[in-house]
Curated annotation (Swiss-Prot):
EC number per UniProt: 3.6.4.13
Protein name, entry field: Antiviral innate immune response receptor RIG-I
Cross-referenced Pfam families: CARD_2, DEAD, Helicase_C, RIG-I_C, RIG-I_C-RD
Motif DECH box boundaries: 373-376
Phosphothreonine: residues carrying this PTM: 771
Gene Ontology BP annotations: antiviral innate immune response; cellular response to exogenous dsRNA; detection of virus; gene expression; innate immune response; positive regulation of defense response to virus by host; positive regulation of granulocyte macrophage colony-stimulating factor production; positive regulation of interferon-alpha production
Length: 926
């Protein structure tokens, strides 16, 4: 089992616990577990139920070290009948299981009616396909020995734990076939909302047991004047009107009056609830026969998912239609029809930009209200700004069509590069101009109430020591110097690139420089094409190795030397597994010559990282003072997330923290991001009182994601601008919370101090702008808008015309010919394949390490350059519908003009302007 599989099993354990009854698979796992462990699991189920038993089973499972146990676990699930769970774990995709949650909630709520009206014997034969065989036997036995209601209760419990995605529909058909009264309540076809509303009619005044969350941050569930724990607040009757706080009404007031507004209020105060108030008021103000249409923009996918849930639960009960669209769903639905058919639409902004550009949405006039979450992003070429460019062109042009009201939400408007209040005011006015805002709403009249809800953490900056001597860095730096010299000697002309001074190893600056050199080498051309191939391939290898060495130095600076060394060992292992030519053998030999010394240095206790020692002291002290402390630890990179998680787990004094990790979904050159279900699972575990006590996160956690209340925030070599500072600090929401900045750099501390000064300037500037009369503020904003439009128009670039000339694609590593652009076809908008058997002879396939099915594609293999000793990664081989085709990535190739011979690199397909021909199945049969 790989470390990643173990980590994923940890991340998804909450899904597994909800479904798995481990006693059903113990017979298959008996050779992997001790007899005593099997007995403990059985006892845990008998005493506390299957969920606690599953938790204990996973605990034992994750302790196993022998090879093969993970596959044995999957086989056990499959043979026991847990096919859905087995499939989810194999692909690490729990979306099908997650979609069942609303049906589980409904069945829990309707369980009294289910027990009162259903005889399990009448429908068990129909439902057997959705249940484990052993569950069917237990239901029959309980029905026969304890009666109908006890049997129905057991059946409901088993259905709620079922991993079969069709169980809600099968239950409906079984109930209808039996003419059961319960079928009137269980209406799957017409949706969860209809079924719930029918249940509400039958329940009368009975309080609902379904919990709803309608806020940006968990503590804002307590919208009354009596702050309490979330569990208390969430038990309110579903239909009781939620009482806003006075400061929330103050924030909502300008927007309720119809003004374009930027709402600037601290993280944790419930800005999402404010947006719900505004949205509800807006939709209700239209006279009979007219309707409003609201669009809510969320910038990040986890935030989008969160807000889609919040808006749905709040507004569906008021009779409004709500829909949500993201990049993951936009290809399979008509965005135009979704917008036409719904009152409220939750969107990621790029979806609207794309549909405005292709004409599917004619203009922004289809909406009556636009709400921008994290609106401080409305700048430069961000999708928010692209939407507002359309808005402002419409406003400043001759069109008479009505424009929607605009509302922006943010914890900080920022000050840009401003050093004075005047410059800050100019920056804020620019943001107001971008959003066409006439008001900045802040809490002024109800500050005392706000301070009772949002606690500003105590900020502590600690300058920590760096290593006084660093033998590890010296050894790696020497290897880098030797590699640079080898690269320099390959080509006299390109060797000049390596003569540039002031490139410090182990820095982001060096990373940027080596990436630039890497690109320059890849398009280097010579008259002798064989020699060009040799030179480019050698330089590709040298620059790749330099980049990995630089990565390792960056890791060792903030983590343990062993983490950096393991990173390099994994890299050289991959090198040996791929094409292993003379150059790579030489580079590997040099590394292995130093490996024993590197191992010795990294294991030496005297080389412990002082930063980690200081982090240890902070955690020890805070958890000693307050054992129930919940911590978010912010770090810069995913590699550091993994390293610190390992460090905490291996430290006996800290392992009780049970660290969780939260990273972004995007892919970097070093790692694949977390899937959305994995992110949600981690957040749920962190919110649970007994699970993770510390969450190690990258920047994905500092903006907008709904993270539970915590009382300790640690910024580990982590600093940004004033907006980032306010957002990360805002994650410490409990009373008496603290925010530590730990860094070895005096510059970082100075930057943080500068951010604190800028925050004061920002607040001061907002207050001054709020004293301006409406006319003065409006004129200032209008002047900026006119000037910005003139600048935009003067810089307007015509759309690039696709180049219809045929071009060559060459391997980005060895420069071997791959294909012509004339043979490339576009599959479903964003995938690119190559036609013809000739191309298939130029690559080799290897099994994909993570085969997966998504939409119409099934990943089957990875494809690599077939030239001897190259094996450059070209993309993947997939099954698309009934076809098996290669899918290539443009960053793996160099594009050569056939006529001029000029070569270029493109990191994204959108930057490569060639004539795109759509995939036609008819061509595959030619």
């Amino acid at each position: 089992m790989t470390a990643e599989q173990r980590q994923n099993l940890q991340a998804f354990r909450d899904y597994i616990k909800k479904i798995l009854d481990p006693t059903y698979i113990l017979s298959y796992m008996s050779s992997w577990l001790e007899d005593e462990e099997v007995q403990y699991i059985q006892a845990e189920k008998n005493n506390k139920g299957p969920m606690e038993a599953a938790s204990l089973f996973l605990q034992y499972l994750l302790k196993l070290q022998s090879e093969g146990w993970f596959q044995a676990f999957l086989d056990a699930l499959y043979h026991a009948g847990y096919c859905g769970l087995c499939e989810a774990i194999e692909s690490w995709d729990f979306q099908k299981i997650e979609k069942l949650e609303e049906h589980r909630l409904l069945l829990r709520r309707l369980e009294p009616e289910f027990k009162a009206t259903v005889d399990p014997n009448d429908i068990l034969s129909e439902l057997s396909e959705c249940l484990i065989n052993q569950e069917c036997e237990e239901i029959r036995q309980i029905r026969d020995t304890k009666g109908r209601m006890a049997g129905a209760e057991k059946m409901a419990e088993c259905l709620i734990r079922s991993d079969k995605e069709n169980w809600p529909k099968v239950l409906q058909l079984a109930l209808e076939k039996d003419n059961s009264k319960f079928s009137e309540l269980w209406i799957v076809d017409k949706g969860f909302k209809r079924a719930e509303s029918k249940a509400d009619e039958d329940d009368g005044a009975e309080a609902s047991s379904i919990q709803i969350f309608i806020q940006e941050e968990p503590e804002c569930q307590n919208l009354s004047q009596n702050p309490g724990p979330p569990s208390e607040a969430s038990s309110n009757n579903l239909h009781s009107p939620l009482k806003p706080r006075n400061y929330q009404l103050e924030l909502a007031l300008p927007a309720k009056k119809g003004k374009n507004t930027i709402i600037c209020a601290p993280t944790g105060c419930g800005k999402t609830f404010v947006s719900l108030l505004i949205c509800e008021h807006h939709l209700k103000k239209f006279p009979c026969g007219q309707k409003g249409k609201v669009v809510f923009f969320a910038n990040q996918i986890p935030v989008y998912e969160q807000q889609a849930t919040v808006f749905s639960r709040y507004f569906e009960r008021l009779g409004y239609n709500i829909a949500s669209i993201s990049g993951a769903t936009s290809d399979s639905v008509s965005v135009q029809h979704i917008i036409e058919d719904n009152d409220i639409i939750i969107l990621t902004p790029q979806i609207l930009v794309n549909n405005l550009n292709n004409g599917a949405i004619p203009s922004l006039s289809v909406f009556t209200l636009m709400i921008f979450d994290e609106c401080h992003n409305t700048s430069k070429n961000h999708p928010y700004n692209q939407i507002m460019f359309r808005y402002l062109d419409h406003k400043l042009g001759e069109s008479r069509d009505p424009l929607p009201q605009v509302v922006g939400l943010t914890a900080s408007v920022g000050v840009g590069d401003a050093k004075t209040a005047e410059e800050a005011m100019q920056h804020i006015c620019k943001l107001c101009a971008a959003l066409d805002a006439s008001v900045i709403a802040t809490v002024r009249d109800n500050v005392a109430e706000l301070e009772q809800v949002v606690y500003k953490p105590q900020k502590i900056s600690r300058k920590v020591a760096s290593r006084t001597s660093n033998t590890f860095k010296c050894i790696i730096s020497q290897l880098m110097k030797e590699t640079e010299k080898l690269a320099k000697d390959v080509s006299e002309e390109l060797g000049k690139l390596f003569q540039i001074q002031n490139r410090e190893f182990g820095t982001q600056k060096y990373e940027q420089w080596i990436v630039g050199v890497h690109k320059a080498c890849s398009v280097f051309q010579m008259a002798d094409k064989e020699e060009e191939s040799r030179v480019c391939k050698a330089l590709f290898l040298y620059t790749s190795h330099l980049r990995k060495y630089n990565d390792a130095l960056i890791i060792s600076e903030d983590a343990q030397m062993t983490d950096a060394l393991n990173y390099l060992k994994a890299f050289f292992h991959d090198v040996r597994e791929a094409a292993f030519d003379e150059t790579e053998r030489e580079l590997t030999r040099r590394f292995e010559e130093k490996l024993e010394e590197l191992e010795k240095v990294s294991r030496d206790p005297s080389n412990e990282n002082p930063k980690l020692r200081d982090l240890y002291l902070v955690l020890q002290e805070e958890y000693h003072l307050k054992p129930e402390t919940k911590t978010i630890l912010f770090v810069k990179t995913r590699a550091l997330v993994d390293a610190l998680k390992k460090w905490i787990e291996e430290n006996p004094a800290l392992s009780f923290l049970k660290p969780g990790i939260l990273t972004g979904r995007g892919r970097t050159n070093r790692a694949t991001g977390m899937t959305l279900p994995a992110q949600k699972c981690v957040l749920e575990a962190f919110r649970a009182s007994g699970d993770n006590n510390i969450l190690i996160a990258t920047s994905v956690a500092d903006e907008g994601i709904d993270i539970a209340e915590c009382n300790l925030v640690i910024l580990y070599e982590y600093v940004g601008n004033v907006i980032k500072m306010i957002q990360t600090r805002g994650r410490g929401r409990a009373r008496d919370s603290k925010c530590f900045l730990l860094t070895s750099s005096a510059d970082v501390i100075e930057k943080e101090k500068a951010n604190m000064i800028k925050e004061k300037i920002m607040n001061e500037s907002i207050l001054r702008l709020q004293t301006w009369d409406e006319m003065k503020f409006g004129k200032t904003v209008h002047r900026i808008q006119v000037n910005e439009k003139l600048l935009r128009d003067s810089q307007h670039k015509p759309q690039p015309v696709p180049d219809k000339e045929n071009k060559k694609l060459l391997c980005g590593k060895c420069k071997n010919f791959a294909c012509y652009t004339a043979d490339i076809r576009v599959v479903e908008t964003s995938h690119y394949t190559v036609l013809g058997d000739a191309f298939k002879e130029r690559f080799v396939c290897k099994p994909h390490p993570k085969p997966k099915i998504y939409d119409n594609f099934e990943k089957k293999a990875k494809i690599f350059c077939a030239k001897q000793n190259c094996s450059h990664d070209w993309g993947i081989f997939v099954r698309y519908k009934t076809f098996e085709i290669p899918v290539i990535k443009i960053e793996s190739f160099v594009v050569e003009d056939i006529v001029s011979g000029v070569q270029n690199r493109h990191s994204k397909w959108k930057d490569f302007h060639f004539e795109r021909i759509q995939f036609d199945p008819a061509e595959m049969s030619v």
